[in-house]
UniProtKB/Swiss-Prot annotation:
Subcellular location: Cytoplasm
Pathway recorded for this protein: Amino-acid biosynthesis; L-threonine biosynthesis; L-threonine from L-aspartate: step 4/5
Superkingdom in the source lineage: Bacteria
Record flagged with keyword Coiled coil: no
Name under which the protein is recorded: Homoserine kinase
Lineage: Bacteria, Bacillati, Actinomycetota, Actinomycetes, Mycobacteriales
Keywords: Amino-acid biosynthesis, ATP-binding, Cytoplasm, Kinase, Nucleotide-binding, Threonine biosynthesis, Transferase
Pfam families named in the record: GHMP_kinases_C, GHMP_kinases_N
EC number: 2.7.1.39
């Protein structure tokens, strides 16, 4: 049985950017950042209206193919509801195609907005586990999606493949001494474009190297930030992507040469530095700025939030 939502319901969702992989944790580790998109949705009698402010304005589709719309509709279907019409307003601060989880934020935010609508009916909203499952299915991997749902850092895993894949995540508490410095370039790059650069198979030697570093990174993030340099080493994906983003690769070299644990954020080209110092070395900052990177400290991001009505704003 399906319930048709009445016109006049409104909901707001706020969802964080995220950085995936964190070096060795390919498709497994994620970290939410304090940079947020906001989605406001209203049910109407018919039709679809989509508006976008900020990142992506004038570039993304404003019809039913919009990722937020698709996620809202998927969330409603999963709860047994439909909306005869929608007005969707997106206010985006998360840069697109930079490796900061903008697509995961769109999906998680859309699902959360659907929850905000459903919570005003007698039907049951999606659980956290369902949010992780549905958003990860959209993405094809759970690292960004789970970080956006739960906030903080996450370890994620996948059972099965294809349509049968099941996704799950466990949260990590990031050590308070760790400072996060995303560095965002003007260059864009999609995950699909850079994923084709990766080999289909890897050696046991390389697999063993990354397994040890990924396990160590969990310790470094939560208990021993002094281990971050060793814990963020990677041989499985960053070297293979370097030729496609030379400025990012060189910036990583400069940062790590200054003793800063720095990695590609997701598939890049953004870079994120994790440091126990409150500022980055001047040499590294000067290099980044000269090469078109915008560098700013961010806090660990919160998990997705939704509410009924239109929020007062960030």
């Amino acid at each position: 049985m399906t319930q048709t939502l009445p016109a006049g319901l409104t909901a707001t969702a706020t969802v964080a950017a995220s950085s995936a992989n964190l070096g060795p944790g390919f498709d497994s580790l994620g970290l939410a950042l304090s940079l947020y998109d906001e989605i406001v949705v209203e049910t109407v009698d018919s039709g679809l209206t989509v508006t976008v402010e900020g990142e992506g304005a004038g570039q993304v589709a404003l019809d039913s193919s919009h990722l937020v719309v698709r996620a809202i509709e998927a969330g409603l279907r999963a709860t047994g509801c439909i909306a005869p019409g929608l007005v969707v307003r997106c206010r985006n601060d998360i840069p697109h195609s930079r490796g900061l989880g903008s697509s995961a934020a769109a999906v998680v935010g859309g699902l959360a907005a659907a929850n905000g609508l459903v919570s005003q009916t007698d039907w049951t909203p999606l659980t956290v586990e369902q949010l992780i499952q549905l958003s990860s299915a959209f993405e094809g991997h759970p690292d960004n999606a789970a970080a956006a749902v739960l906030g903080g850092a996450v370890v994620t895993w996948t059972d099965g493949a294809g349509a049968q894949a099941r996704y799950a995540a466990a949260p990590l508490r990031v050590h308070p001494d760790i400072h996060l410095f995303p560095a965002i370039p003007q260059q864009r790059s999609s995950t699909a474009e850079t994923r084709v650069l990766l080999p289909d198979t890897v050696s046991h030697t390389d697999a063993r190297f990354n397994l040890s570093r990924a396990a160590l990174l969990v310790v470094a993030l939560t208990e021993r930030p002094d281990l971050l340099m060793a814990a963020t080493e990677d041989v499985l994906h960053q070297p293979q992507r370097a030729a496609a983003m030379p400025a990012s690769a060189e910036f990583l070299r400069v940062l790590r040469g200054c003793g800063v644990a720095a990695v590609l954020s997701g598939a890049g080209p953004a870079v994120i530095a994790l440091s126990t110092e409150p500022v980055l070395p001047a040499e590294a900052v000067e290099f980044g700025i000269a090469n078109g990177f915008t560098i700013a400290e961010m806090a660990v991001g919160d998990g997705v939030r939704w509410s009924t009505g239109v929020a007062a704003g960030r």
